[in-house]
Swiss-Prot record:
One of its GO terms (cellular component) is virion component. It holds the Pfam family Flu_NS2. The gene is NS. Keywords: Host nucleus, Host-virus interaction, Transport, Virion. The lineage of its organism: Viruses, Riboviria, Orthornavirae, Negarnaviricota, Polyploviricotina. It comes from the Viruses. This is Nuclear export protein. Average number present in a viral particle is estimated to be 130-200 molecules. Mediates the nuclear export of encapsidated genomic RNAs (ribonucleoproteins, RNPs). Acts as an adapter between viral RNPs complexes and the nuclear export machinery of the cell. Possesses no intrinsic RNA-binding activity, but includes a C-terminal M1-binding domain. This domain is believed to allow recognition of RNPs bound to the protein M1.
C-alpha cells in the first residue's frame, strides 16, 4: 500500500474531526466513520491481492464478497456526492481544501478498489 495514501487518509480524517459544522456535525462524524471503514476495506482487499492466492480465503470468510464490494462502491459514490455538496456550500477555505483533498482521495481509493477487485476476479 502506498504510504502517501495512508498519510492522506490520516491527515484528512484528523482535519475533518477538527471541523465544526454546526448542526451537521453528526453528518460529518458519519462521513469520518465511513472514511475509516472504507480505508480498512481497501487495506484488506489490497492485502488479499498481495497474497494473490487468497481469493478462496476471502470467499470463505465472506461468501458474499461481491455483494459487499458493490456496497462499498455505493458508499464511495455517496461520500463523493456528500463531499461535493459540502464543497459547494462551504465558504471556509480550510474546509474547502479539506473537502477537495477528501474528494481526490475518494476518487483514488475508488480506483484502487476497482483495480484490486479486478485482480481478484
Amino acid at each position: 500500500m502506498d504510504p502517501n495514501t495512508v498519510s492522506s487518509f490520516q491527515d484528512i480524517l484528523m482535519r475533518m474531526s477538527k471541523m465544526q459544522l454546526g448542526s451537521s456535525s453528526e453528518d460529518l462524524n458519519g462521513m469520518i466513520t465511513q472514511f475509516e471503514s472504507l480505508k480498512l476495506y481497501r487495506d484488506s482487499l489490497g492485502e488479499a491481492v498481495m497474497r494473490m492466492g487468497d481469493l478462496h480465503s476471502l470467499q470463505n470468510r465472506n461468501g458474499k464478497w461481491r455483494e459487499q464490494l458493490g456496497q462499498k462502491f455505493e458508499e464511495i459514490r455517496w461520500l463523493i456526492e456528500e463531499v461535493r455538496h459540502r464543497l459547494k456550500i462551504t465558504e471556509n477555505s480550510f474546509e474547502q481544501i479539506t473537502f477537495m483533498q477528501a474528494l481526490q482521495l475518494l476518487l483514488e481509493v475508488e480506483q484502487e478498489i476497482r483495480t484490486f477487485s479486478f485482480q481478484l476476479i
